[in-house]
Design a protein with these regions (language model features):
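Loop-to-helix element that buttresses phosphate recognition and phosphoryl-transfer chemistry
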Residues: 10-60, 122-134
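Short glycine/proline- and acidic residue-enriched helix-loop micro-motifs
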Residues: 106-128
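Active-site metal-binding loops of divalent metal-dependent hydrolases
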Residues: 9, 157, 201
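GST-like fold's C-terminal all-alpha helical module
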Residues: 129-157
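Alpha-helix capping/helix-boundary segments
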Residues: 57, 159-160
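Phosphate-coordination/substrate-recognition cap region in phosphate-metabolizing enzymes
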Residues: 37-107
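Extreme N-terminal starter segment of soluble prokaryotic enzymes
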Residues: 1-4
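Acidic, low-complexity terminal tails and accessory targeting/binding regions
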Residues: 85-99, 142, 146-149, 165-217
């Protein structure tokens, strides 16, 4: 079994430098282009199963990637466990030096050790997201339906890192260097129920096109 996990393409929310979370922000034109380029580079892979977050930026990314595929493609399934972290009342607030609005002076912990950050009163905790992404991963590697299949998952930056904790050797390093770029692809090879990361934050477009405003301030 191989699991290909893709972060969604660029959105205007990414460009504005705001927390999107469960806000249903669509892809922008560049985000669609990045998904198309990525899809062309994955076109030879025969995906047996495709599962997406229900949020449109992830679902449309999945659609575009499959549209470029040269093999028969599966119908996209939707799974809430792949949704981004719910930031609650912090959603759509700015997090850059120019537009910072988060009412928590310790928000930089989000970038350094998010397990120490107290979430908004109406949002999810890091552990909440880790538990639901662990749940879908364990389901994928254990159920006969998924055995020996190529699986495409479309998700979000934070949820992706939570899911990859199942295969990271160093689980204390949450971000492993950075928030994944838009349309970054991570590949897990699963043999006898054990997953190994064989592709780490792969991007298939010109790296100068990557925009990442999500950095400590």
């Amino acid at each position: 079994m191989k699991i290909y996990i893709i972060r969604h393409g660029e959105t205007n929310g990414n460009l504005r430098g705001v927390l999107q979370g469960w806000t249903d922000e669509p892809l922008n034109s560049k985000g669609r282009k990045l998904a198309q380029i990525t899809g062309k580079c994955l076109a030879s892979i025969g995906f047996d199963i495709a599962i997406s977050s229900p949020l449109s930026r992830a679902y449309e990314t999945c659609e575009i990637v499959l549209r470029e595929n040269r093999n028969p493609v599966p119908t996209i399934e939707v799974d809430d466990r792949l949704k981004e972290i719910n930031f609650g009342c912090w959603e759509n607030l700015g997090i850059t030096k120019k537009n910072y609005q988060i009412p928590n002076k310790n928000f930089n912990l989000f970038y350094t050790n998010p397990f120490l950050l107290e979430n908004s009163y109406d949002g999810e905790s890091v552990c909440d997201v880790c538990h639901r992404t662990e749940d879908i991963y364990l389901e994928l590697i254990s159920k006969p339906r998924y055995r020996d299949k190529n699986i495409l998952l479309a998700t979000h930056g934070f949820a992706l890192r939570c899911l990859l904790r199942q295969v990271y050797e160093d689980k204390t390093d949450f971000w492993h260097g950075k928030i994944p770029d838009n349309c970054a692809v991570n590949i897990i090879d699963v043999v006898d129920g054990k997953g190994t990361l064989i592709g780490d934050d792969l991007i298939y477009y010109d790296k100068t096109l990557a925009v990442n405003p999500y950095t400590p301030i």
